[in-house]
Amino acid sequence: MTAIDPQGLEKHTPMMRQYLTLKAQHPDMLLFYRMGDFYELFYEDAKRASELLGISLTARGKSGGDPIPMAGLPYHAVEGYLAKLVQLRVSVAICEQIGDPATSKGPVERKVVRIVTPGTLTDEALLQERQDNLLAALYQGKTGYGYATLDVASGRFVITELANTEALEAELQRTNPAELLYSEDFSEMSLIAAINGTRRRPEWEFDYDTCHRLLLNQFGTKDLKGFGIEDARLSLQAAGCLMQYVKDTQRTALPHINSIVRFNQSDSIVLDAATRRNLELTVNLQGGRENTLASVLDNTVTPMGSRMLQRWLHQPLRDHDIIRARQVSIEELLGNANYEILSEDLKAIGDIERITTRIALRNARPRDFARLRQALALLPQLQQTLTQAAAPHLKYLSQVIGEFPDELELLSRAVVDNPPMLIRDGGVIREGYNEELDQWRKLSEGATDYLHELEAREKQQTGISTLKVGYNRVHGYYIEVSRRESDLVPLSYQRRQTLKNTERYIIPELKEHEEKVLSSQGRALALEKQLWEQLFDLILPKLHELQDFARASAELDVLCNFAERAESLNYHCPDLSTAPGIQIEAGRHPVVEQVSQSPFIANPVTLNNERKMLIVTGPNMGGKSTYMRQVALITLMAHIGCYVPAEHAVIGPVDRIFTRIGASDDLASGRSTFMVEMTETANILHNATPNSLVLMDEIGRGTSTYDGLSLAWSAAEYLAKHLQAMTLFATHYFELTQLPELLSNVENVHLDAVEHGDSIVFMHAVQEGAASRSYGLQVAALAGVPNCVISAAKHKLHQLESRDHGKESCDAQQPLQQSISFSAPTPSPALEALAKLNPDELTPRQALDYLYNLKKLAL
């Protein structure tokens, strides 16, 4: 059987009919079907789970005449398997036994009690603690796109309206959703093809009236005007679909989702998808997280602070007032070194943001409450440090963080110091919190003393030295005697079980005690679970304040982190200016300087109305791309409030950062390297403004020399003359160095290098003026290109240069198409002798003689 057919249920066994009915309700998910101590999967689910999880595929009899493929996994190990499936973007429906097997006629009643999808995770074990886990929904309208994201683990709900595919692509890359819902009428499938975890939803789920009503019900408001989103029709349709999906999967109230924010692209510096990729903000070009800007800047002490920092990196602000408030806060934290004290306190606070959400969803575990108690206990100490702050923003954060003395007192009374992982077996509620619970526990715990007394008494009365009292879940309490002493057992003992070396018995007194003990244990556990549920009710009224406390603590963590990074890495506070331009003195690349084995060479840059474009030339590997990227990264860092790796920086208004650096074939879309390059260039030429920072690196490659040169020249001229964008334009077309002679706002700069014979030393220093040459052959030699190829290339280079200069030499008159000789270069006796020389073994006299001999060989 390869397909599940709910219509033909009558031919299956009762259990399989139950399974198939439940599976039909969750066709796109793996169904974990509880069978005793295992979760079992059948049919195609079993085959898929076997492949994804590496578990055995077997068969479970037949149903409907066909073998049933089956795979199983232990219930106690389910979280590990769920974590693996979530990473693979696979959703799971978990079906539990909710009926009593003892009273059930036919299959035990079962129900799907939990749905785990990649975008709706809240369980600590399934989440990456330092990364947001976003569920997104996308709706396409006639005027653009509506896009909504929700971090279920924090309640952060954001919508935005996007005018075109370029903006949508950038937003998808910025948010990087774990799961994406899209309507069945969505037409731009190439934009979402690379996203794992996409879910196609019926068009009616995006109905505006239904979505609008859903959101009103969630927020408990009469309209959405208070959120400023009433006119965002497309994104409200996306948000409504998303909200319904979360309700369906969580199957509980969602009180932590209590607001919605509209993200306006005009509030932040626009970074398109290519720019985010090329600048390696949080993910490097290979898809990893090492050697990124985040890897250098993120020394936060809380997971929620780390997540906030990454959001800031992808959303640099344009509002100078907010940026300056952050700068002033960092300055004060540095001035009195309070960031060190605050960071120690924040480290102990942990991830309150996600703990608060689990409390709101009523799926928090005992240790979540213990961590919340620990965090609340630290607040007086944290506030004592913050009260010394003069910076207005630090005062504001102190006010928002607040204190929670009543909740701290409650948790201190209610929860033991080191609670178990789960409430299932009790032991969570502290002694003294509830008098009735204490009484039931005493009755239960007193059983142990009684059993010891009974065992000692029976040993003495019977004379059986091996007699002992035991317990198991099947037979309850029993008296165990070795087989060799079983003839001493009194007639009043009733045999319960015979084992290989022992006999087990019961007596009426022990049975009566068992009933009392089990009754007291059961009542104690039931009451403890009831008190546990009441804890949620007592904490939830403070939910909003706890969420604010978490967000403010995360921001304080980021600011303390920026202070630490500034001091540790020698960063300085940039000046924000209303005058256009970017001026950086002794700027450094924040990532390269950390991974470089040699001292980083700092370089300046000046861009203003009189100097809008810099034509950057110099050798391959000379540092052109590094130089350009560092200007963009310093500019971006300045706009998140961070200090920057420069002696001094003045940054004017910036609305966008564009990068056209490097390219590769887009095989999925069937686009060549050159096509990708031209598409990115077109985007820049259509959207750049005088306040945009543009990085253009080596455009025009991948086509003929004259085509490439013409395109590069025209693009540079258009940027400088018509758009007047702040541009760094790196090129190997030396003809472009003539642009400053034609345009007054263009200048030449170059990366310096020193040639020594056939070798080259890169100085990595930016100098005014154009480079004299590109040193391509020297770089090729450094890369290990065979000497014969280098020699042939030198010959061809001389031939080309001779022709270009109109020389009448024999070489110049030879056709360029002539065959190149790749014979090895003639050996040099002088070089061979020099290679065999060990200078440490020579006396001064021998060295002088050797030098004369080398000169003769060279001649």
Curated annotation (Swiss-Prot):
GO terms of biological process kind: mismatch repair
Keyword DNA-binding recorded: yes
InterPro entries according to UniProt: DNA_mismatch_repair_MutS, DNA_mismatch_repair_MutS-lik_N, DNA_mismatch_repair_MutS/MSH, DNA_mismatch_repair_MutS_C, DNA_mismatch_repair_MutS_clamp, DNA_mismatch_repair_MutS_core, DNA_mismatch_repair_MutS_N, DNA_mismatch_repair_MutS_sf
Gene3D superfamilies registered for this protein in UniProt: 1.10.1420.10, 6.10.140.430, DNA repair protein MutS, domain I, MutS, connector domain, P-loop containing nucleotide triphosphate hydrolases
Gene Ontology MF annotations: ATP binding; ATP-dependent DNA damage sensor activity; damaged DNA binding; mismatched DNA binding
SS bond partners: none
A GO term from the CC aspect: cytosol
Residues that hold ATP according to the record: G618, P619, N620, M621, G622, G623, K624, S625
Keywords: ATP-binding, DNA damage, DNA repair, DNA-binding, Nucleotide-binding
Similarity comment text for this entry: Belongs to the DNA mismatch repair MutS family.
NCBIfam families hit by this protein: mutS1, PRK05399.1
Xref: PANTHER family: DNA MISMATCH REPAIR PROTEIN MSH1, MITOCHONDRIAL (PTHR11361:SF34), DNA MISMATCH REPAIR PROTEIN MUTS FAMILY MEMBER (PTHR11361)
HAMAP family: MutS
Summary of the function given for this chain in its UniProt record: This protein is involved in the repair of mismatches in DNA. It is possible that it carries out the mismatch recognition step. This protein has a weak ATPase activity.
Protein name (Swiss-Prot/TrEMBL): DNA mismatch repair protein MutS
